[in-house]
Structures are given as C-alpha cells and as structure tokens.
C-alpha cells in the first residue's frame, strides 16, 4: 500500500514541499532564513491577532488600549513585546535572506526573485502602518512625514495625500484605515509567500557553488527539517532574550508619549530597519529627488538580474565581487547609523557619500568587477 502522504491530495502537496523535496546536499545555514521568515510571519499573525482582540483603532483610546494590554490583559505585555520585537527579527531574517540571494546569485530565478521584491515592499508597508497604531508621538509624526512624501508627486500629490489621510491631517480616519491595512496585509504576504515557494519549487534550490546540483540531491526530511528546527530554536531564543531582557532596546522613547499634533519631536526617525532608506531620502536636498531615491533604493533590487555580467552565478569563486559585496553591507550599516543621527555636519556629508556609494556599487562597480573577473578566467 502506498503511503497516505503520497496519495492524499492535500498531504501530497505538503510531502512534495517539505518531506520528499529533492534538495542540494551542500546548502549552508544561509538557506535557513526562508523557513525562519515563515516562522516569523506565523508568530506575527498569531500575536497580532491576540493584540487586535484588545486594541481600539480610535485616536482617543488607541494609546490607552496599548497601556491596557500591557497592564490588565493576561500576559498582554509579552504578546505586545513579542509582536514589536518579532518585527525586528522579521527584518533581520529578511535582510539576511536577501543578502544570501545577492551573494550566491539566487536572483537568477527571476520569478522567485521578483515575487521576493514584491514581498519586501508588502512587509515594509505592513511594518509602517503597524508602527502608527500605538498612536504615540513617533507613530503620529512618522505617519505625517512619510505620507507627506507623496505630495512630491507632480499634479496629483496633494490630493493623493489627503485621500490617504481621509481628511486634512493624520487623524481618526487615518488610524482606522491603517489598522485595516495592518490586519489584511499579513494575509496577502502569506499568499505571496506561497507563490514565492511555488516558483522556487519549479526550479529547485540554488546552492553555494551556483552550479546545478541535479546529480546530488537529498530529501528535505530529515536532513533539512532538523537543520531548520535548529535555526528556529536560535531565532526563538534570540527573540525571547530581546523581549524579556530588553523589550524597548529597539523602540523609540518618544512613542511612550501620546500623539500630540501641536508638538513635534526633536528628531523624527523610523524604526531601525527603515533607517538606511531614510538616510538616502534625507541625503538629497530636493523633495521629489529624495522620494525617487528612496523608492529606487528598494526598487533597484528588481534590476539586479539584469545587472549580472559574470559568467559564474555565485560569488563563491569571485574575490573582487566578494569584496564589493561586503563593502555594500558596510555601506548599508553606515546608512542605518546615519539615518538615526540628526541632520547636521558631519552626518549629512557622510550620508550623501554613503548614498552615492550604494547606487554606484550596485549599478557600476559590481557589474564592472564581474567583467574583470570574466577576463581573468581566460588567463
């Protein structure tokens, strides 16, 4: 008799995706982040669901409802902080996952990569609208500043901003719709993640060498299920350490002050995971130019498959490209640091240099290094 997991219509899908899936035998721990992102998403949906049961999306009671969750609801404080710090863990895994894709040339699977870029935009949108919900000072002013960027769009800008606000400023209507968006978007992310996986399983996984591994595959279970469980345990441990010992480490103290439209915080800044893009936005003195640079800093990822000039897929055997990749990582860390600093000398000039270097690396230096490496292969 054939095993039920191979015959049952539903079990067959699970079997082909997580049990009998032929997987390259040499994929490293950098391939763990996909499953960790799935885990993060499930955790965020579950903690978010329980938070939504006690939260009120109204300007007069939103801040108080968060206080109520933390003080009066059974284990409400841990649910709230797991959700807030879970977002940080989500982005750590997301950036590691993208870095892996860049380094090992996983972007050659174009459909998978493009869905990934769409997923990144969706996750960023979800995190942004979610940050507005506690209705603290940084929530309010963050929402005001970021939505206001759309007014840079010629002709329709101002109308568009007021349409998104649902009025003439960030107010009750804005908060209510942002709550609705924050509730629906994770389910859209879940659907997109399934499509992402569907496209990946059409081609099979890449591996560190970038060479086809069809002749050397092993079943996903038990080899990679156990490896994923180890990754999951490390993720949960890190999240619990952060949540239980330093829950406010990554948050902004200003968000413990209720939103006040009459008083602007000294330094308006987003959460750490958006700081690199915020630094690029601020480094351009022109409003429309800044908005375009901000959009392009993420959208540039969609053009990476077209910028691949190397004859090799992975960077494993390409020292020049490896060096430039780590320069890019250092540059992004620099931008993240600059984004959290006030707009004054010397931070401004450092931010401008780092922003130019970011685009220069991706558009010019890395493709050029690949061409040089192609020439060196003929020696």
UniProtKB/Swiss-Prot annotation:
GO molecular function: metal ion binding; ubiquinol-cytochrome-c reductase activity
UniProt cofactor(s): heme b
Residues the entry annotates as binding a ubiquinone: 201
Binding, heme b b562: 83, 182
Signal peptide: none
Subunit structure: The cytochrome bc1 complex contains 11 subunits: 3 respiratory subunits (MT-CYB, CYC1 and UQCRFS1), 2 core proteins (UQCRC1 and UQCRC2) and 6 low-molecular weight proteins (UQCRH/QCR6, UQCRB/QCR7, UQCRQ/QCR8, UQCR10/QCR9, UQCR11/QCR10 and a cleavage product of UQCRFS1). This cytochrome bc1 complex then forms a dimer.
The protein's name in its UniProt record: Cytochrome b
Taxonomic source organism: Eubalaena glacialis (North Atlantic right whale)
Gene: MT-CYB
